[in-house]
């Protein structure tokens, strides 16, 4: 059965989603989870784009050994040099070069003739191949390119040393029939095509990214590029979990397989959703909250008699536990440590102690601690390594239907002093945020506020996501707590601390903070 390589670009193309700005610890945590998922290649970022991206790509390349790590580069020498410096310590250093090949891109964006584009592509591939054993070359906007020209430039870059050829549907324009024909055309018209692997990369502007990816595989693609939860620029990218499960469930049709560990899919999806702040829709295939829910009485009756009547995917296949209660207030440290290690924890003893303390605090308030609860507590610790300049000490809110909502907060300041302030608002959250703004003594513009429960039930943990403009920088923050108001305050301060850390990072490395 033909093996399909899975190329995950969550940390590069996925991070280009509007409002997503992952910090160093968050990128590392996602990369380690992608390794546990079994992806073949992790596109860790664009090393030449910023010092922050360079450092995170370098760290991921040095840490991750179970998956190959790659970075994006334009067809210019300085980008290739930056990629090499970031990736040379990787287990299998590889680079991802690109240049546009469609008439509209060549004329209006590149302002180059087709001949100049071929020359530039060949020059960059030769230079990259002198350092990297694996050179992937992408024809940006391939689906809107002239096929004879595309075949010509592909042959040229193969001769120059490319080992993987990627044909992206950059703007989500093509259809399954068209993309299959494109791959078949290249297989038939590029003399050296059998010397390389073919890759597909599809965007979801017309809602066909997954369908196009599967059609490309039928047309001869050996590698599929995708993101967790389908996140990405504009309408997003092809969804890794949907492609992976489709290839698994329909092996009879596609006659291919991947090396993914499917039971890690739900955990990976939840992690990416939490760290990016991009909520997974309830009706999302494979990982949505309703993916295995049956409302119709006829459907429920059928599932009770035989699950296969209406469930082609079992929850267990993708890591959705049917019995999610795992620990309680009387659980000991050994059982706790075993469970968090099962969930993928690889942190320090100090982090483990902090998670155990948070677990015990939660267990006093919540009778049943689920895997989702534990995973949320674990994530808070493993990606919370940034300096907290402002720390919430106490929070008290007075609320009543006929009263003025008032919040009183004590907070530890960067100086080490503890300050107290109070303010009112039309609602409890507004009162909290008005109080925090007074303590910060700086204007804050709240751009987005979202809340969701991590598990069901009235005692569920709350997860709050905010996006704000603070000191001219747009940052996001997250907060998790048993109480939604406490989670709201934590999310606010998390965003503030992230802004300060980003500015300090920029001062050290001389890189511009994007506004």
UniProtKB/Swiss-Prot annotation:
Which Gene Ontology terms describe the biological processes this protein takes part in? L-leucine biosynthetic process
Signal peptide feature range: none
- Cofactor(s) the protein needs: Mn(2+)
Q: Does the keyword Manganese apply?
A: yes
Reactions catalysed, semicolon-separated, are:
3-methyl-2-oxobutanoate + acetyl-CoA + H2O = (2S)-2-isopropylmalate + CoA + H(+)
- Please name the pathway: Amino-acid biosynthesis; L-leucine biosynthesis; L-leucine from 3-methyl-2-oxobutanoate: step 1/4
Listed Gene3D superfamilies: 1.10.238.260, 3.30.160.270, Aldolase class I
Q: What does this protein do?
A: Catalyzes the condensation of the acetyl group of acetyl-CoA with 3-methyl-2-oxobutanoate (2-ketoisovalerate) to form 3-carboxy-3-hydroxy-4-methylpentanoate (2-isopropylmalate).
Q: How does it assemble?
A: Homodimer.
Spell out the protein name for this chain.
2-isopropylmalate synthase
């Amino acid at each position: 059965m033909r093996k399909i390589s899975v190329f995950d670009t969550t940390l590069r193309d996925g991070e280009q989603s509007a409002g997503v700005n992952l910090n160093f610890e968050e990128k590392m945590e996602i990369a380690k989870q992608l390794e546990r998922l079994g992806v073949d290649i992790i596109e860790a970022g664009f090393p030449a784009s910023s010092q922050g991206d360079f450092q995170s790509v370098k760290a991921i390349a040095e840490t991750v050994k179970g998956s190959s790590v790659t970075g994006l580069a334009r067809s210019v020498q300085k980008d290739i040099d930056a990629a090499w410096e970031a990736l040379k310590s990787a287990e299998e250093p590889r680079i991802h070069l690109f240049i546009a090949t469609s008439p509209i891109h060549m004329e209006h964006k590149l302002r180059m003739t087709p001949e100049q584009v071929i020359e530039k592509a060949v020059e960059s591939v030769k230079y990259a191949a002198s350092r990297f054993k694996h050179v992937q070359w992408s024809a940006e906007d391939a689906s809107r390119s002239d096929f004879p020209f595309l075949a010509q430039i592909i042959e040229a870059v193969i001769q120059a040393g490319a080992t993987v050829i990627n044909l992206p549907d950059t703007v989500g324009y093509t259809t399954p029939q068209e993309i299959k024909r494109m791959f078949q055309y290249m297989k038939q018209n590029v003399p050296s095509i059998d010397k390389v692997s073919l890759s597909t990369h599809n965007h979801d502007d017309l809602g066909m990214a997954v369908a196009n990816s599967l059609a490309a595989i039928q047309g001869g693609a050996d590698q599929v590029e995708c993101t967790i939860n389908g996140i990405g620029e504009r309408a997003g990218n092809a969804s890794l979990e949907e492609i992976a499960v489709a290839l698994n469930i329909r092996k009879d049709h596609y006659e291919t397989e991947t090396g993914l560990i499917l039971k890690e899919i739900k955990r990976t999806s939840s992690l990416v959703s939490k760290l990016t702040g991009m909520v997974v829709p309830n009706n999302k295939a494979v990982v949505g909250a309703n993916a295995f829910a049956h409302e119709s009485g006829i459907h429920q009756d059928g599932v009770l008699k035989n699950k296969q009547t209406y469930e082609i995917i079992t929850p267990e296949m993708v890591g959705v536990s049917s019995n999610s209660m795992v620990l309680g207030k009387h659980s000991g440290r050994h059982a706790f440590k075993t469970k968090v290690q099962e969930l993928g924890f690889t942190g320090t003893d100090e982090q483990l102690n902090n998670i155990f303390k948070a677990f015990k605090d939660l267990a006093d308030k919540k009778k049943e601690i689920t895997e989702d609860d534990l995973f949320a507590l674990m994530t808070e610790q493993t990606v919370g390594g940034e300096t907290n300049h402002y720390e919430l000490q106490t929070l008290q809110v007075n609320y009543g239907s006929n009263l003025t909502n008032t919040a009183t907060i004590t907070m530890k300041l960067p100086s080490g002093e503890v300050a107290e302030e109070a303010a009112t608002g039309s609602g409890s959250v507004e009162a909290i945020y008005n109080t925090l703004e007074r303590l910060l003594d700086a204007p804050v513009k709240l751009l987005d506020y979202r809340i969701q429960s991590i598990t069901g039930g009235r005692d569920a943990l709350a997860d709050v996501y905010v996006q704000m403009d603070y000191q001219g920088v747009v940052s996001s923050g997250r907060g998790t707590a048993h109480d939604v108001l406490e989670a709201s305050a934590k999310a606010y301060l998390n965003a503030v601390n992230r802004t300060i850390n980003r500015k300090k990072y920029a001062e050290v490395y001389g890189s511009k903070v994007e506004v």
